[in-house]
Regions:
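AlphaC helix of the eukaryotic protein kinase fold
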Residues: 43-64
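Protein kinase catalytic-loop region centered on the HRD/HxD motif
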Residues: 119-131
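Conserved catalytic-loop aspartate of Hanks-type protein kinases
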Residues: 193
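Activation segment signature within eukaryotic-like protein kinase domains
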Residues: 115-116
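Conserved short submotifs of the Hanks-type protein kinase catalytic core
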Residues: 82-96, 100
Length: 266
């Protein structure tokens, strides 16, 4: 089934760039300034308080961080006539790092490290603003027109406040990059983001997420949950300090894990 027809005053919809379980992303032209943008339209209407909270959470989180060089800027947001929410973001013609891994495999170690440093800086800035991302993965790291990388999709983002609901269903997780405690519905924390960040850097280095077989065999959720408890095995050819940082950031138990994205960056 194709995406629903979308019309938005002030924008010319050009083509579908991608479609996932919860949203469709279009290439569009912002007529007032003649700028090409990415228009992300949710496939669900804002019919429940939970849906409205989710959308406001994403917009607020992304808006707080839009000035960061490694966060995709948000230009506009709102609700269509049929109650589907939308966001207008910077168009990143280089696609995602997930796309690149699929096409080319692992990245050179220096490039993976440099990308990791930039993303860690973005995550540290998010945490300093009280924002958790909760879905860091190569598919949510975009490459802009200048070749820079930036984190996008704060759809699961949470801003911790006393009494606020922070839970998320298993169906909304990306199992290969989610921290082990997320499968047991533990409260999200900065340590969870650090795990997902480290898992993303690991995938850039190896071409696959942590604990995944080299032959590409798919794992069931039950198998992955068990493998998440396995200790980190050093990657050959990496400087000892790099392996140490990954080992500390990928610890299965949050209490034993590096929880400061700034420290991981260093």
């Amino acid at each position: 089934m194709g995406p629903e027809r979308t019309d938005l005053p002030g924008y010319e919809i050009q083509e579908v760039l991608g479609q996932g379980g919860f949203a469709t992303v279009y290439r569009a032209r912002q007529l007032a300034v003649g700028r090409e943008v990415a228009l992300k339209v949710d496939s669900r209407v804002l019919s429940t308080p939970r849906d409205r909270q989710r959308f406001l959470r994403e917009v607020t989180a992304a808006g707080q961080l839009s000035g960061h060089p490694h966060v995709v800027p948000v230009y506009d947001a709102g609700v269509l006539a049929d109650n589907r929410p939308y966001m207008v973001l910077e168009l990143c013609p280089g696609g995602s790092l997930g796309d690149r891994l699929h096409r080319q495999g692992a990245l050179p170690a220096k490039e993976a490290r440099d990308i990791g440093v930039g993303l860690a800086d973005a995550v540290a800035a998010a945490h300093a603003s009280g924002v958790l991302h909760r879905d860091i993965k190569p598919g949510n790291v975009m490459v802009n027109r200048y070749g820079g990388v930036a984190l996008t999709d704060f759809g699961l983002a949470a801003m911790p406040r006393p009494g606020r609901e922070l839970s998320v269903t298993r169906e909304a997780l990306t199992p290969a990059y989610a921290p082990p405690e997320a499968f047991h519905m533990a409260d999200p924390s900065p340590a969870g983001d650090v795990y997902s960040l480290a898992a993303t850097v690991y995938a850039l280095l190896c071409g696959r997420p942590p604990h995944y077989p080299e032959d590409g065999t798919q794992l069931s959720l039950a198998e992955l949950i068990v493998r998440h408890t396995w200790p980190y095995a050093d990657l050959p050819g990496l400087p000892p300090a790099f392996n140490t940082a990954l080992r500390h950031a990928l610890a299965a138990a949050p209490a034993h894990r590096l929880s400061d994205a700034g420290a991981f960056r260093e």
